[in-house]
């Protein structure tokens, strides 16, 4: 089963897929002129609540338009909890970072915030949850 989740922004491709009991949420982002990006999980204009336990997060810089070295990534719940617990700071622009054993229960829409990435750079973030 696959559920496509898309926001109204043309700068994001956000979708979920289901593999057995594991689900995958993917954000493909492009930063604005200030090097920032922010997007909440939405479906047809409504907040899309993630229900489950986050197990793994991958932060992947684009190969052709990579972000500035040392950019920051935060994934937060509606109550402001940083799912990455601050580990999304100072990301390398030439390597995928994978965070295992997150084990954070979530019952909230999630917001991806990228900062310090440089003008119109790209990347993606994958969140695996059960």
Predicted regions and their residues:
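Surface-exposed, low-hydrophobicity beta-strand/loop segments enriched in small/polar/acidic residues
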Residues: 2-130
């Amino acid at each position: 089963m696959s559920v496509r989740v898309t926001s109204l922004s043309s700068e994001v491709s956000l979708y979920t897929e289901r593999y057995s009991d594991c689900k995958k949420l993917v954000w493909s982002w492009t930063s604005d002129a200030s090097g920032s990006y922010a997007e909440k999980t939405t479906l047809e204009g409504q907040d899309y609540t993630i229900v489950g336990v986050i197990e793994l997060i991958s932060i992947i810089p684009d190969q052709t338009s990579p972000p500035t070295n040392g950019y920051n990534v935060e994934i937060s719940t509606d109550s402001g909890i940083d799912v990455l617990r601050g580990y999304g700071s100072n990301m390398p622009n030439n390597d995928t970072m994978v965070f295992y054993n997150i084990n954070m229960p979530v019952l909230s829409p999630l917001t991806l915030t990228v900062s310090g990435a440089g003008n119109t750079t790209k990347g993606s973030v994958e969140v695996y949850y059960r």
